[in-house]
């Protein structure tokens, strides 16, 4: 990783990304969210009946401190703990509260030292899968399966002024919502349908949220790999 081409899907053309803008309750908190995949950026750019833009950038990562959640030292629970920290969600049951608190206590990473974060993007459907796991409804294996259903792709998130200084705008493409919103919706619908089918399968030997709490499972537990 040195120089990367990144794309940002947006209803606007963004020639100069600005540090400090964006929602604090996105997956990894406030930041500038990009992807290395043009087609995904085009999907993210469009809403129903509204076209968008896929902004293209180059970033030089030399000298940046980048957290890659897909590296072997981290597990899906590290990613999930970050979602519990930053995303808004309704805690509807006592087990969900215990699960979210446990994840944040034992798996939450401090993003403060990092200039950028690489990790999964949690569309609404995938966030519902994560909630189901924290609520003890599905096993860790089923959650991992669910995350692969829609080919989420990774996002590259700029978090610090140092990262914003490294990104350079190249160009943009207009994205037709009749094409790309339809693709996004179809991918989401397919993932939800496959997940519903997975829910009908009992994973009797699986590792569930209550097991993790009861057994005090730690990040180095081989069952998390």
PLM features per residue range, with description:
Residues 11-12, 38, 61-63:
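Short, flexible loop/turn elements at secondary-structure junctions
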Residues 58:
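Exposed, tryptophan/tyrosine-rich binding patches on extracellular proteins
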Residues 2, 48-52, 61-225:
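Conserved NAD+-utilizing ADP-ribose enzyme module
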Residues 1-27, 55, 214:
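ADP-ribose/NAD+-binding catalytic cleft of ART/PARP-like enzymes
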Residues 7, 17-18, 38-40, 112-113, ...:
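N-terminal, helix-rich and Lys/Arg-enriched segments in bacterial and organellar proteins
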Residues 23-48:
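Extended catalytic/binding region for NAD+/ADP-ribose chemistry, centered on the ART fold
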């Amino acid at each position: 990783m040195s120089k990367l081409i990144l794309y940002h899907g947006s209803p606007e053309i963004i020639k100069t990304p600005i540090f400090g803008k964006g929602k604090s309750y996105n997956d990894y908190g406030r930041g500038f969210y990009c992807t290395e995949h043009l087609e995904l950026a085009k999907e993210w750019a469009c809403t129903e009946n509204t076209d968008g833009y896929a902004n293209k950038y180059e970033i030089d990562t030399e000298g940046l401190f980048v957290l890659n959640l897909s590296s072997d030292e981290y597990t899906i629970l590290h990613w999930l703990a970050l979602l519990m920290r930053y995303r808004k969600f309704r805690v509807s049951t006592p087990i969900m509260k215990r699960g979210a608190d446990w994840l944040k206590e034992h798996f939450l990473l401090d993003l403060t030292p990092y200039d950028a974060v690489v990790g999964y993007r949690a569309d609404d459907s995938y966030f519902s899968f994560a909630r189901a796991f924290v609520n003890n409804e599905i096993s860790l294996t089923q959650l991992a399966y669910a995350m692969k259903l829609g080919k989420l792709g990774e996002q590259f998130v700029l978090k610090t002024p140092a990262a914003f200084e490294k990104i350079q705008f190249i160009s943009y493409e207009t994205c037709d919502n009749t094409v790309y919103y339809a693709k996004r919706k179809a991918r989401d619908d397919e993932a939800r349908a496959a997940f519903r089918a997975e829910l009908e399968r009992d994973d009797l030997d699986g590792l569930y949220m209550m097991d993790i709490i009861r057994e005090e499972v730690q990040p180095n537990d081989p069952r998390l790999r």
